[in-house]
């Protein structure tokens, strides 16, 4: 699985800590991590939580990422922004049990974490435990065991609902404010990470043309 890390600007200084912790957990599992920044608070590309949502939508709908880890001060804004886009099912994770239950019950492809609220002493240990619970036990297996069948059924129903209520990502890219879109994909390493991994020719071609 290719996991993309996105940090919004208010918590950019924590990117190295989050990346190191994420890699420590998931790379031994065979997963790959692509760090889309922000890398420092002074980066030229300033990713707000709304841009984090747009970037998550681009990565997941193009196939350039299989999973997105993002967040903001509370995680709420990033979660709301991510869920604004088609093909993105984002959960808000506060503790390790959230990680396990979101993976098993909701089977999403994106998570938003609070990187300021309650992010104090031992934060890297909490992150490590969340990532182990999120990625270490598969996805969509249900919890508790007696709820597996209805939970898996409801997930399929939710996917069908989202397919109806959301527009195709390529249409959104055409209609969204183009300056906002250009700013979102102007990260230092966006091109070198995104284009080789992109599986959607229409999305890739449109963004490259910008």
Residue ranges and their predicted role:
Residues 15-16, 53, 75-81:
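Short glycine/serine/threonine-rich phosphate/pyrophosphate-binding segments
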Residues 4-17, 100-210:
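C-terminal binding/interaction regions
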Residues 29-46:
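A short beta-strand-loop structural module common to alpha/beta enzyme folds
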């Amino acid at each position: 699985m290719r996991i993309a890390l996105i940090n919004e600007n208010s918590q950019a200084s924590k990117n190295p800590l989050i990346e190191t912790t994420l890699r420590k957990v998931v790379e031994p599992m065979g997963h790959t991590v692509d760090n889309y920044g922000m890398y420092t608070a002074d980066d030229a590309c300033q990713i707000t939580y709304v841009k984090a949502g747009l970037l998550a939508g681009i990565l997941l709908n193009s196939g350039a990422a299989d999973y997105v880890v993002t967040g903001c001060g509370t995680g709420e804004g990033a979660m709301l922004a991510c869920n604004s886009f088609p093909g993105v099912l984002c959960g808000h994770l506060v503790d390790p049990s959230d990680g396990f239950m979101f993976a098993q019950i909701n089977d999403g492809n994106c998570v938003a974490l609070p990187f300021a609220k309650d992010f104090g002493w031992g934060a890297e240990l909490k992150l490590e435990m969340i990532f182990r619970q999120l990625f270490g036990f598969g996805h969509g297996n249900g919890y508790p065991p007696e709820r597996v069948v209805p939970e898996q059924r409801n997930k399929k129903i939710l996917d069908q609902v989202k397919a109806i209520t959301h527009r195709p990502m390529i249409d959104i890219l055409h209609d969204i404010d183009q300056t906002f879109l250009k700013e979102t994909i102007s990260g230092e390493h966006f091109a070198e990470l995104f284009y080789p991994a992109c599986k959607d020719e229409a999305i890739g071609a449109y963004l490259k043309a910008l």
